[in-house]
Amino acid sequence: EWKCIAQEYVKLNIAAKEKADKEKNQTIRSIAKLLSNALYGSFATKLDNKKTVFADQLDSSTAKGIANGEFSVKSSSFIETDCLSAEIMSELVVAYSPDTLLHPQQEGATEANTQETPTFIGPTDHVTYTYKPITFLEAEEDEICLQTIEKNSPLIPNDRYPSHIASFVLAWTRAFVSEWASLLYSEDLGTPMERRCLKSVYGDTDSLFLTEEG
């Protein structure tokens, strides 16, 4: 039993396209044509054989597939950590007396003598340095690593799009255009291509662009 698929949708877009032609509204015409083509294109959509997961969330079957060559890791990237909770340690300051380290205090030294030891201040004009804060992030490497995994087999299981409908539509339109082409070139059968009269300049899935002779 033959049944129409998306008949109301197709009629609505065709009517909108014809109305736009009469009103010379190219914007509406383009939108209507785009929606009509999108219906056929949706049936022929190819499923993506890639998936992106966190490295620590790889299931056992995918990990086994990577090991035996069924899958391959196409890319690895790390997410931005600026928005994650972290602890920032600012400039580290260490105060010590090298002079004290070189001359340890003798036993029995009084506290007063210790306080009288001058603070060592070395020269600062022979070296330059820049302090940078240290960021401590509580996250493992696998927790912020994104891996894009692709299946190596060209055969992709399709349980989402009715590609058989797209194949039927494409085959039917090719048969329709082929029938018109046979009528157009019926007089040229047996004639070499270079000697035939130019009757068409372009052929699309469902259309032929003809010359004046055609």
Curated annotation (Swiss-Prot):
- What EC number(s) would the UniProt record show? 2.7.7.7
Instruction: Tell me where in or outside the cell this protein is found.
Output: Host nucleus
Check the record and name the InterPro entries matching this protein. Answer: DNA-dir_DNA_pol_B_CS, DNA-dir_DNA_pol_B_mt/vir, DNA/RNA_pol_sf
> What GO molecular function annotations does the UniProt record carry, in alphabetical order?
DNA binding; DNA-directed DNA polymerase activity; nucleotide binding
Chief location bin? host cell
Q: Tell me where on the tree of life, at the top rank, the source sits.
A: Viruses
Query: Which Pfam families does the annotation name?
Result: DNA_pol_B_2 (PF03175)
The protein's annotated catalytic reaction(s) are:
DNA(n) + a 2'-deoxyribonucleoside 5'-triphosphate = DNA(n+1) + diphosphate
Q: Which cellular components does GO assign to this protein?
A: host cell nucleus
Assembly notes: Heterodimer with the terminal protein; this heterodimer binds to bp 9 to 18 of the genome. Forms a complex with viral pTP, DBP and hosts NFIA and POU2F1/OCT1 for initiation of replication.
Q: Relate the protein's function as given in its record.
A: Eukaryotic-type DNA polymerase involved in viral genomic replication. DNA synthesis is protein primed, and acts in a strand displacement replication. Assembles in complex with viral pTP, DBP, host NFIA and host POU2F1/OCT1 on viral origin of replication. The polymerase covalently transfers dCMP onto pTP, thereby initiating complementary strand synthesis.
Q: Which family does it belong to?
A: Belongs to the DNA polymerase type-B family.
- Additional comments on file? This DNA polymerase requires a protein as a primer.
Q: What is this protein called?
A: DNA polymerase
**Source organism of this protein record:** Tree shrew adenovirus serotype 1
